[in-house]
Amino acid sequence: MADSLELVIDTIMAREVLDSRGNPTVEAEVLLEGGAIGRSIVPSGASTGAHEAHELRDGGKRYLGKGVLKAVNHIEENIAPALCGLSSLDQATVDSVMKQLDDTDNKSNLGANSILAVSMATARAAANGLGLPLYRYLGGPMSSLLPVPLMNVINGGEHAANNLDFQEFMLVPHGAESFREALRMGAEVFHTLKDLLSQKGLSTAVGDEGGFAPNLESNKAAGDLLMQAIEQAGFKPGEQVSLALDVASTEFYEEGQYCYGGNSYSSEQMVEELAGLVNSFPIVSIEDGLAEDDWDGWSLLTKKLGKSVQLVGDDLFVTNTLRLQRGIDENIANSILIKVNQIGSLTETLEAIELASRSSYTTVISHRSGETEDTTIADLSVATKSGQIKTGSLSRSERVAKYNQLLRIEDELGSQATYAGLVGLGPRGSLKG
């Protein structure tokens, strides 16, 4: 067991590195007195909610304005002096000090990217100092639930240069006995889908999250393709592998109307469109089915589908306890997407997860479209017993890195490991029983 002095923060460094889109992002390193090091890199999103914490960029010509040297500077000149000498074990204090230093509601002074990088690196340094895996350090000895992956195998919207309006069409291999088997099932459907696309003369180029990005005549056509791929891979749709959608509807919401596919829909009509898809396909989860500030529309959607489908708020809640509490109070949605960089610190992320859990909302731990080799979210999904993770398709190493980390965790847990399966999917899981 490490001496408490060995776990005191000694040095904090930062640098500008690249994410999976070739854009700069922030990496932080926290060195403890005893020699343990924690390193973390923050992700960034393409379809970002208006209520997310502020990601600080440099502007100007360098990296087309997307440099992060200001954020790196803030870490080394403002954050490091304030944190050195504190215990890495006191995550809440570390994050609170940074929040006070920033002194804005959305972290626009220091930047959520600088605060989060240090926050996550501190947790990893503490875990390394104690000789514990990160999931065990964050979650304790009872953390043994492996999440169901929501695998984004067809990309559209802001994640791909194609004509699909909905952003993600996902596989959900809930019928597996283990995470390892779930990953295999997803990979087999992914490769079958690639063959199907090739046979139809469609593009097999991949989007930001590693899924295919073909031009298709409609969102329904994407669902039909996935059903065909699941069956041809030898699995039963709805029993072993189901579907999930990220509509990302804020991206095509204009003046109170949802405009896509050459048509405009009111909130009521959009709800009926989604209900029609649920009737046509084994859809277990819909994310951002309505826009981030269309609270009345969300209420209609929840009344229509909330007892049969997981309704996930991403742009709606932005990992923010204030917005989540409003959703809970108004019975809106039944699940929250958890993105660490939406709120900008590990402590606030854990608070959002705790509030959701207390209120019987499911949680889905999620990557961003601009990702890195950092695997923190894999450990976080196990630590928090979330039961679900979104980390892209079965290609691109920044996506696969998280899957591989979950394989390692499952191996390490051995007979203690439990795969969440259908139970992890909230209302749909309880109905299927």
Swiss-Prot record:
Location(s), subcellular: Cytoplasm; Secreted; Cell surface
The protein's Enzyme Commission number: 4.2.1.11
Superkingdom assignment: Bacteria
Keyword check for Metal-binding: yes
GO biological process: glycolytic process
A Gene Ontology molecular function term of the record: magnesium ion binding
Annotated residues for binding of (2R)-2-phosphoglycerate: 167, 339, 368-369, 390
Active site (record annotation): 209, 339
UniProt entry tagged with the keyword Secreted: yes
Pathway annotation from the record: Carbohydrate degradation; glycolysis; pyruvate from D-glyceraldehyde 3-phosphate: step 4/5
Pfam families for this protein: Enolase_C, Enolase_N
Leading EC class: lyase
SUPFAM superfamilies reported for this sequence: Enolase C-terminal domain-like (SSF51604), Enolase N-terminal domain-like (SSF54826)
Function text: Catalyzes the reversible conversion of 2-phosphoglycerate (2-PG) into phosphoenolpyruvate (PEP). It is essential for the degradation of carbohydrates via glycolysis.
Name assigned to this protein: Enolase
Species name: Prochlorococcus marinus (strain NATL1A)
